[in-house]
Amino acid sequence: TVYGLNRIQATTDAYLGLPVDVLGTEHIVLGWPDLMGQLRSEFAVLATEDGTDVTYVPKAKTTSGTEIGVATTTTLNAGEALPVASLNGDLSGSVVTSTKPVAVFGGHECAFVPDDNTWACDHLVEQIPSTSTWGKEFLTVPLKTRSGGDTFRMIASEDATTVSVNGAAVATLDRGQVHQMSIDGKST
């Protein structure tokens, strides 16, 4: 098992690294909204093989000037990365496709979770599984020290996806749409 850690002064986040043999060719980014165009939503794509064509369609304008919904393709070789950051907005729901398996990481420079009323921000990073590995049922368990619940973001890979918590429908999402909520206690 690999545990990735990104630590800088006053902020840290970590993620479970996924092995190369489970990487895929389609990913939908999950990150966090930017804050006033200063603290950015971001993702990165890492190639595992030479000559990998990577296409992304962003859900927010990027710092490189790519407009919302405009497909951009670049070729990466093994070990090369394509970093993408929002100019403003949330890159969650951006679709990344590739001709060969890639690793995709979603996150944020320094997010205020659960909202802007939080007194300090933290860097966020998570390796995003390819859509071919996504499941339909998940269990949540609260962290013992949390007094107000844990924040969850759910994203759909298909149109008309119903999100249910403890058997009750809480949202209907189309591909790339996000539903965010706080959940108290253990849930399914």
Language model features: what each stretch is:
Residues 1-93, 97-188:
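Conserved functional hotspot residues at active sites or interaction interfaces
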